[in-house]
UniProtKB/Swiss-Prot annotation:
Compartments where found: Secreted
Lineage, top ranks: Eukaryota, Metazoa, Ecdysozoa, Arthropoda, Hexapoda
Disulfide-bond pairs as recorded: none
Expression sites (tissue/organ): Brain.
Function: Myoactive peptide. Increases the amplitude and frequency of spontaneous contractions and tonus of hindgut muscle.
Main location: secreted
Organism of provenance: Rhyparobia maderae
Name of the protein in its database record: Tachykinin-related peptide 10
Keyword Endoplasmic reticulum: no
Key words, A-Z: Neuropeptide, Secreted
Source domain of life: Eukaryota
GO biological process: neuropeptide signaling pathway
A Gene Ontology term for the protein's cellular component: extracellular region
Length: 15
């Protein structure tokens, strides 16, 4: 996900 969460916006945003 892109902006799923604060953490997701960092490394998870790449996926």
């Amino acid at each position: 996900s892109g902006l799923d969460s604060l953490s997701g916006a960092t490394f998870g945003g790449n996926r």
